[in-house]
Structure formats: structure tokens, C-alpha cells
């Protein structure tokens, strides 16, 4: 079944588009995190889904049960000639509190943990540098230790259509996502 992106107008796919790279972020409710990437020049597609767990093709209800180990995630396809990975990472780190472990604000559970799934090892250095720089900023502002997991992209399962671009379709919809107020200097 083809899904059309509500913001960009193109087809949503789990495959990375030609001449783009992808990265997957988990940082709380995927509705709010996805919205953060829509207006960035160089981002060509976003979608929400589930990754990092053990169940094939999980449903939202299964993920929320906590038994699948999946995380609510946002897949960002971008043109590396138009936007750098560090700029996407800045949005990610500043959008949520990566020190909260298995929660983001009022959203509690393993599906809300902070993760970065990279396409290949070439991206790991940039991601780890950004983590270390943001950790320093957090410590300087009396926050705790970052709990974000970094690993190679595992299987990505597209979430149900009603979750895709949810806050564009429902501008007054719930979003408990909130950052720390700290800025990434990279």
C-alpha cells in the first residue's frame, strides 16, 4: 500500500531514496520529533516507524506494550550535498532530553528511549563527536549523563498511516517532546 507524505507530497518508502542518505532518530514521541525536520533544506523525506526491537512488523499497540523492545523512531532521508549530518544531529539533540533513559517528559516506556541508528560506520565519528560535545554542554548546565544508544540501523518498520505526519494533519495534537534548552556547538 502506497502512502503519500502529507507535507512533502511524495511517496513514503522504507528504502533510502537515490542520491540521499538516511539516519534514524528516537527521542520520545515520534510525532513531535518528525515535525522538527520538515522545514530543513536538504531533508527530502521523513517517516515515523519502529526499530531496534525483536518483533517483525510490530503494531503501535505491540510497541506500546513494551514487549517488542522497539523504539518510536523518525527516519530522515537527506541530501548530504545540501545538509550536513551535524545539522540533523543538532536538531535531534536540542529537541529532546537525552538524559532521561526510558522516557521523555510524561511519555514513559522503553519505546521512548533516545537512539541514533546510522547507515554505516562512516557516520559514527560525527554522531559520537556530537554526543560528546552535547554531553559537555549538558554537564555545564547541571544535567545528567546521556543515555542515547548509537548503532547501525536495524530493521525499520513503517508505522501505521495515521501516525505519519500526525502533527501536520492534527496541528493541535499532543506532543510532549521538550528539549533541555542546551545548544549543540558543532
Regions found by a protein language model. Name each.
Residues 1-186:
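Flexible coil/turn and secondary-structure edge motifs
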Amino acid at each position: 500500500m502506497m502512502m503519500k507524505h502529507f507535507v512533502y507530497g511524495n511517496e513514503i518508502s522504507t528504502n533510502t531514496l537515490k542520491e540521499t542518505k538516511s539516519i534514524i532518530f528516537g527521542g520520545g514521541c515520534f510525532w513531535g520529533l518528525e515535525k522538527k525536520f520538515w522545514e530543513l533544506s536538504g531533508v527530502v523525506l521523513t517517516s515515523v516507524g519502529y526499530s531496534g526491537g525483536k518483533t517483525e512488523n510490530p503494531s503501535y499497540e505491540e510497541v506500546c506494550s513494551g514487549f517488542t523492545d522497539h523504539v518510536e523512531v523518525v527516519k530522515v532521508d537527506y541530501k548530504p550535498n545540501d545538509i550536513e549530518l551535524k545539522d540533523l544531529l543538532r536538531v535531534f539533540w536540542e529537541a529532546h532530553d537525552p538524559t532521561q533513559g526510558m522516557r521523555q517528559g510524561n511519555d514513559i516506556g522503553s519505546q521512548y528511549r533516545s537512539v541514533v541508528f546510522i547507515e554505516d560506520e562512516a557516520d559514527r565519528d560525527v554522531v559520537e563527536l556530537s554526543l560528546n560535545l552535547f554531553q559537555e554542554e549538558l554537564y555545564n548546565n547541571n544535567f545528567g549523563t546521556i543515555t542515547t544508544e548509537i548503532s547501525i540501523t536495524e530493521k525499520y518498520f513503517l508505522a501505521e498511516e495515521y501516525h505519519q505526519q500526525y502533527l501536520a494533519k492534527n496541528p493541535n495534537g499532543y506532543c510532549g517532546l521538550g528539549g533541555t534548552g542546551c545548544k549543540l556547538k558543532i
